[in-house]
Amino acid sequence: MRIDPRSHTPIYIQLADLLREKIESGEFAPGSTLPSELQLSQEHQIGRESVRMAVALLRSEGLIRTSRGRGTWVREALQREHIELTPGSSAIARMPSSRERREMDLDEGVPVIEIRGPKGEVYVLPGDQTELIRP
């Protein structure tokens, strides 16, 4: 797949699709570092802003992590905790507050699951590490 500047699809979306495909195929394995912004820009002959936007999109999807000065890498598959919902409980998915994101070390774009127990107790869990089970 190549970036087509004449396409109706924005360049950053094309690059995000290309990188996503390489991640999903295993060409960029979990934990591996992606090429730098400059390398991607030069390799695909596109502007650095398009690269930044593509990386931001993949980060919001939870596929990659970025760290200033350290680079960008593919997220490892996370172990999921199985939580059994008790009768009378409810669960919703929502975006975390900045405090929750910091406390749970959540990447941008990762939701939380808020569970309300039958007695009104509230638990907030990372959405990418939680699997809900109905009894």
PLM feature spans:
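Extreme N-terminal segment that seeds HTH/winged-HTH DNA-binding domains in transcriptional regulators
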Residues: 1-46
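Beta-hairpin "wing" of winged helix-turn-helix
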Residues: 28, 32, 61-69
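Hydrophobic alpha-helical segments that drive targeting, anchoring, or assembly
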Residues: 38, 47-48, 63-66
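Residues in the helix-turn-helix
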Residues: 50, 57
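Short, structured interface segments
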Residues: 69-75
